[in-house]
């Protein structure tokens, strides 16, 4: 392992999809990694591939950000690990369901992960980055945050929150050498989609 001049990137939702791609690309650019997700087996697999291919130091944290104890553990890492220079807030929960037939507990979990956990991680990372002289925060939003559609009202609202929060903090943090950006992906076929049944219910004949 070679010491990273760029520091360490902590990535949530890193076991598959966009999070795993971020892990791969950041490792190629010289970052060491802390990968966070719910599945330890999947995390271990991603970590091994990256470590073997690029020789970066890769640490994993099994955490469900919808669980307060797990979330607090990740916050503590952000506050206390001086090597961390980037936070990628990628973990999220989605669903495709009319409001009238939705389960309110599922909606609450979506808000907890997409809004509350993301916000708490930003506020764990930002003061630490300022004290260390700089850093980068990437918040995963969605095109649905600016273009709401039916069946995705709560999800789109959570992503609109992410966009608003990011814009609000951009000026404040840029003056302290901390960059923050919101990423607004459109339709991306990932395991996240399979879990929310988006593919079969919204685009049954358009994706292969």
Q: How should these model regions be labeled?
A:
Residues 90-95:
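Conserved NAD(P)H cofactor-binding loop of Rossmann-fold oxidoreductase domains
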Residues 122, 158:
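Active-site helix of classical SDR
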Residues 164, 170-208:
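SDR active-site lid
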Residues 29-45:
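Conserved glycine-rich Rossmann-like NAD(P)H-binding loop of the short-chain dehydrogenase/reductase
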Residues 142:
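Residue(s) in the substrate-gating loop at a strand-loop-helix junction
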Residues 98-111:
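Substrate-binding pocket helix/loop in short-chain dehydrogenase/reductase
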Residues 15-16:
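Conserved glycine-rich cofactor-binding loop
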């Amino acid at each position: 392992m070679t010491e990273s001049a760029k520091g360490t990137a902590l990535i949530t939702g890193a076991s598959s999809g966009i999070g795993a791609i971020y892990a791969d690309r950041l490792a190629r650019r010289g970052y060491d990694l802390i990968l966070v997700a719910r599945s330890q087996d999947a995390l271990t697999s991603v970590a091994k591939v990256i470590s073997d291919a690029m020789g970066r130091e890769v640490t994993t944290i099994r955490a469900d950000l919808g669980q307060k104890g797990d979330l607090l553990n990740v916050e503590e890492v952000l506050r206390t690990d001086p090597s961390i220079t980037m936070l990628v807030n990628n973990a999220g929960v989605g669903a495709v369901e009319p409001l009238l037939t939705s389960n309110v507990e599922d909606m609450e979990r979506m808000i907890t992960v997409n809004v509350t956990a993301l916000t708490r991680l930003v506020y764990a990372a930002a003061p630490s980055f300022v004290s260390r002289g700089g850093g980068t925060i990437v918040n995963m939003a969605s095109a649905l945050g600016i273009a709401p559609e039916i069946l995705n009202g709560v999800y789109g609202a959570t992503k609109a929150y992410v966009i608003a929060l990011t814009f609000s903090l951009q000026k404040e943090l840029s003056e302290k050498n901390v960059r923050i950006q919101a990423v607004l992906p459109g339709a991306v076929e990932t395991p996240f989609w399979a879990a929310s049944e988006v593919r079969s219910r919204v685009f049954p004949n358009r994706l292969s």
